[in-house]
């Protein structure tokens, strides 16, 4: 027996139509660094999204599920792209502007992006890559910035405002299959090449509803959310989609992500909510300590990407900002857990302990812990295992594997289809997750991941280096940073500055990933099967047993 309910597909275009009409007076405010920020209502966002869709279809010839990439900061035009591209049936591909150039080029080519919408200030990042991007036919430039580096581009260059000007402000959005691809993000490639995660209209719609639930972020049209988490970072944790569902106003920082402008926009625009990784909040705390401001409107802060130090959480409590942990990853859209303490703990000593966990699982996320032998680990708050999840907004494969088939590597997906997160932790009987380690030795720095293997391979390509092991060590500012331990070849005398420069120049390692901490060791400790025993190195560092040099 089937129900008598209507079968209406869950589409991003329905979120756009709802937000631009029912919540048409809500606004996206984009910080400009000038006396007055730029303001645009959701009604205007809806009209301009339609114009952009017409421009992409009629002006640039985008058809079907072709990919349109964005290389942009958080701003109103990026929100328009968020809605126009998937609503017309194409696929939004947000590019991580912090990736090394080679990875960016690989990702664009792997996704076969046909159009790139870029902020003018990011042209210096894009222009050198264009000769390596054969699929890109059009470049659309938005906002201030020198266009000169694009003058020799073989792709056609368009101005965003000129491209959409005069086009219809209404679009007959197609009735798509809700399972159709809407957007894609690539993982940061901690093991091998980056991997593409493709989100459906259905998954984004359901995830947005979860973001808005009271036990998640619980935002309404009375709120303004300062969206610091980048729109290229797992769709800004779902906030741009969730906001138009409930009319949440958005304050977008554009490229002004430094502590001083963030403090100024909090004081001037008075957001009630903000979302970012811990390193942003550490910098903001230092700024507010040095130069106090009225930030009393901001009462709720969502932190993800890495754990928030208890001292930072307590410091923001004193400022009246309640920090709330959330956990997720690119493959989980990303919302998996949110750390809102259960009712019985409020006002007790247990409340803060609950807040320090990664949180309780959302209703759409099933979770289990698996031991080394594949055994199921109980939810007892003590027994640790690798976290595996599944649900309607959880990836079941990666995009475009061999023979263009979905890629399901055994280290990422179980035989019965669950996502292996690579995170190790415990789950309490009432469903609160506490992460204790990484299954692999990924370094989480400021909410972004650094591959220890990539650094090791680059180091060991230096002629003076016999072996190299890189491990994560605690860092007050970034959460974790890489420690490079190297074994020099006999007679070699390479200094650390030289090795660091080699990583950047020959190893093509992004500047922010370069280690500051270095040490020479006689040999890399190994396990019984010959693998690097990194826990020994971490213990030696913690106990002060390594002679570490810290570079500036």
What is each model feature region?
Residues 28-75, 79-83, 100-105, 159-162:
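Conserved AMP-binding/adenylate-forming core of the ANL superfamily
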Residues 58, 87-165, 489-492:
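Structural core segment of the AMP-binding/adenylate-forming
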Residues 59-63, 167-180, 184-226, 238, ...:
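Conserved adenylate-forming
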Residues 99, 105, 116-120, 391, ...:
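AMP-binding/adenylate-forming catalytic core of the ANL superfamily
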Residues 205-224, 234-272, 287:
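Conserved AMP-binding/adenylation subdomain of ANL enzymes
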Residues 268-276, 282-353, 366, 373-378:
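Gly/Ser/Thr-rich phosphate-binding loop
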Residues 360-364, 372-412, 448-450:
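Conserved ATP/PPi-binding loop(s) of AMP-dependent carboxylate-activating enzymes
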């Amino acid at each position: 027996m089937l129900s008598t309910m209507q079968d209406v597909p869950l589409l991003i275009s329905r979120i756009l139509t709802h937000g631009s009409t029912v919540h048409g007076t809500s606004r996206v405010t984009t910080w400009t660094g000038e006396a007055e920020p730029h303001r645009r209502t959701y009604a205007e966002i809806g009209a301009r999204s339609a114009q952009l869709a017409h421009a992409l279809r009629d002006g640039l010839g985008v058809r079907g599920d072709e990919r349109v990439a964005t290389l942009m900061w958080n701003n109103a035009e990026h929100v328009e792209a968020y809605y126009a591209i998937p609503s017309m049936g194409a696929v939004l591909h947000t590019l991580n502007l912090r990736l090394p150039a080679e990875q960016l080029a690989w990702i664009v080519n792997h996704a076969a992006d046909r159009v790139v919408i870029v902020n003018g200030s990011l042209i210096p990042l894009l222009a050198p890559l264009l000769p390596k991007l054969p699929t890109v036919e059009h470049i659309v430039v938005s906002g201030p910035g020198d266009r000169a580096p694009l003058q020799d581009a073989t792709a056609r260059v368009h101005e965003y405002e000129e491209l959409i000007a005069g086009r219809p402000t209404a679009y007959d959005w197609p009735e798509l299959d809700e399972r159709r691809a809407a957007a894609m993000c690539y993982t940061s490639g901690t093991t091998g090449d980056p991997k593409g995660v493709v989100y459906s209209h259905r998954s984004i719609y359901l995830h947005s509803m979860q973001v808005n639930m009271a036990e998640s972020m619980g935002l309404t049209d009375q709120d303004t959310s300062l969206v610091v988490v980048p729109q290229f970072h797992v769709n800004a944790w779902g906030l741009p989609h969730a906001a138009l569902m409930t009319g949440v106003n958005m304050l977008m920082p554009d490229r002004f992500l430094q502590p001083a402008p963030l403090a100024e926009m909090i004081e001037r625009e008075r957001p009630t909510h903000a979302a970012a990784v811990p390193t942003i909040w550490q910098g903001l705390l230092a700024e507010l300590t040095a130069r106090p401001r009225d930030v009393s409107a901001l009462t709720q802060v969502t932190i993800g990407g890495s754990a928030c130090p208890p001292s930072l959480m307590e410091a923001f409590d004193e400022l009246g900002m309640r920090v709330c942990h959330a956990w997720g990853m690119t493959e989980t859209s990303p919302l998996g857990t949110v750390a809102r303490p259960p009712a019985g703990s409020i006002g007790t000593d247990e409340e803060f302990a609950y807040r320090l966990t990664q949180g309780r699982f959302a209703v759409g996320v099933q979770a289990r812990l698996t031991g080394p032998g594949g055994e199921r680990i109980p939810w007892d708050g003590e027994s640790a295992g690798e976290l595996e999840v599944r649900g309607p907004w959880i990836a079941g494969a990666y995009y475009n594997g061999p023979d263009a088939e979905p890629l399901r590597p055994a280290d990422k997906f179980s035989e019965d289809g669950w996502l292996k997160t690579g995170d190790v932790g415990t789950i309490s009987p009432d469903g609160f997750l506490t992460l204790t380690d990484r299954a692999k030795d990924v370094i989480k720095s400021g909410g972004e991941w650094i591959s220890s293997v990539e650094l090791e391979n680059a180091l060991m390509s230096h002629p003076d280096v016999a072996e190299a092991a890189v491990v994560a060590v605690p860092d007050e500012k970034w959460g974790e940073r890489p420690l490079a331990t190297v074994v020099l070849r006999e007679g070699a005398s390479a200094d650390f500055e030289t090795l660091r420069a080699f990583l950047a120049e020959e190893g093509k390692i992004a500047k922010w990933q370069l280690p500051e901490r270095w040490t020479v060791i006689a040999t890399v400790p190994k396990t019984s099967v010959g693998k690097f025993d990194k826990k020994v190195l971490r213990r030696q560092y913690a106990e002060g047993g390594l002679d570490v040099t810290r570079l500036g």
